[in-house]
């Protein structure tokens, strides 16, 4: 391997380390903000305050706070050294981390107030940008930042394709070359596999009655005598055997689908286990894409998803989805279960959406919440 290859590999690893450090510190800062909002009325955490909770619970809260604050402090210096490589979204994440660390400069977060800066932060930010632009290494830092973002995008797309294609390929290949021949071979010897389900039996009986009526109707239209009992019996016997084969095939098809789905699930879990680092990069990539949207675009996407899954016309979509899943798994689509599911699950989803907007989006992007309310009729 040449020197350029070694340098490229080192730069790629360094960029992934920066993304990982920024993601960990950002999640820790969000955890601290969540503790402030939930237990301290959106004020800084104070370890000398009694929260009125059980001692074990209060101890756990403070332990989580200290751990998150240590992560922010430990990673902040290394991230700030590579500030020039960060894009606009990552700089916003870094600003959140810095604001959290500044709030807790004293030991154990005892201070409630911090001394105001002598100059506005926006003016200091302008000076900092000018200094970075005049830095002799500014061009190298910009190129390094571009390479890091490019590597992050490639890693994200690769793990995303693996998470989609590996389960699909495993499902189709295992079903075609392993599961189907195996089930077809052992099904006649195992009563459970060759047993025709009651729903399929009822469908076969209805088809047989319809076939008998078609024979009699065709004889009346052609002006012929009705078939004799023996002829009718022979035709019905052949049709019954055909319907039984179709029912058996449909029954084994459901079993094949279930086994293939299990194989696909195992493949997906293995991809997630062996690609934990890449999944962290993928999360950062999605965060960058989502937070890079304008406020109107964010509000539009939220309204679109809520209307699809919990909106006025969502019951029809849930009905079609549940019936398709039931047919795929070979189980009867019970109307009572579908009605109960539609009456409860969309309500739970709507509650989760509202809680997420109140708890998270309202802090990260208040302007998006305002735009969302305006686009949603003020609700």
Swiss-Prot record:
Supply the Pfam families for this chain.
Answer: CemA
**Parts of the chain that traverse the membrane:** 153-173, 254-274, 300-320, 337-357
GO annotation, cellular component aspect = plasma membrane
Q: What molecular function does GO assign, one term?
A: proton transmembrane transporter activity
> Keywords for this entry?
Cell inner membrane, Cell membrane, Hydrogen ion transport, Ion transport, Membrane, Transmembrane, Transmembrane helix, Transport
Annotated membrane topology is:
Multi-pass membrane protein
**Top-rank lineage group of the source organism:** Bacteria
What does this protein's UniProt record list under function? Required for H(+) efflux immediately after light irradiation to form a rapid H(+) concentration gradient across the thylakoid membranes. Together with PxcL, contributes to transient H(+) uptake following dark to light transition.
Q: Which family does it belong to?
A: Belongs to the CemA family.
NCBIfam families in the cross-refs: PRK02507.1-4
Q: What is this protein called?
A: Proton extrusion protein PxcA
**Which source organism?**
Synechococcus sp. (strain RCC307)
């Amino acid at each position: 391997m040449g020197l350029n290859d070694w340098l490229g590999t080192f730069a790629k690893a360094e960029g992934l380390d920066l993304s990982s450090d920024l993601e960990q510190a950002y999640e820790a800062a969000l955890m601290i903000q969540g503790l402030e909002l939930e237990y301290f009325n959106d004020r800084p955490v104070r370890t000398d305050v009694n929260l009125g909770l059980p001692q074990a619970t209060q101890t756990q809260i403070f332990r989580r706070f200290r751990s998150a604050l240590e992560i922010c402090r430990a990673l902040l210096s290394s991230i700030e050294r590579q500030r020039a490589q960060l894009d606009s979204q990552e700089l916003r994440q870094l600003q959140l981390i810095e604001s959290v660390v500044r709030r807790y400069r004293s030991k154990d977060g005892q201070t409630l107030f911090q001394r105001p800066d002598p100059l506005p932060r926006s003016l200091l930010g302008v000076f900092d940008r000018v200094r970075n632009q005049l830095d002799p290494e500014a061009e190298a830092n910009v190129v390094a930042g571009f390479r890091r973002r490019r590597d992050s995008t490639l890693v994200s797309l690769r793990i995303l394709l693996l998470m989609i294609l590996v389960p699909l390929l495993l499902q189709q290949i295992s079903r075609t070359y392993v599961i189907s021949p195996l089930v077809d071979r052992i099904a006649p010897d195992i009563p459970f596999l060759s047993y025709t389900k009651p729903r399929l039996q009822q469908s076969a009986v209805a088809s047989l009655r319809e076939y008998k009526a078609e024979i009699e109707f065709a004889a009346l239209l052609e002006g012929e005598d009705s078939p004799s009992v023996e002829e009718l019996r022979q035709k019905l016997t052949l049709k019954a055997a055909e319907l039984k084969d179709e029912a058996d095939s449909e029954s084994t098809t459901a079993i094949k689908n279930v086994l293939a789905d299990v194989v696909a699930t195992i493949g997906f879990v293995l991809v997630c286990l062996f690609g934990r680092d890449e999944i962290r990069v993928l999360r950062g990539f999605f965060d960058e894409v989502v937070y890079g949207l304008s406020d109107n675009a964010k509000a539009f996407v939220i309204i679109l998803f809520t209307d699809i899954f919990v909106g006025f016309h969502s019951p029809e979509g849930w009905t079609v989805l549940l019936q398709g899943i039931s047919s795929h798994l070979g189980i009867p689509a019970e109307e009572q279960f579908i009605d109960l599911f539609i009456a409860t699950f969309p309500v739970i989803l709507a509650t989760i959406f509202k809680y997420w907007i109140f708890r998270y989006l309202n802090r990260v992007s208040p302007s998006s919440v305002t735009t969302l309310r305006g686009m949603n009729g003020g609700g």
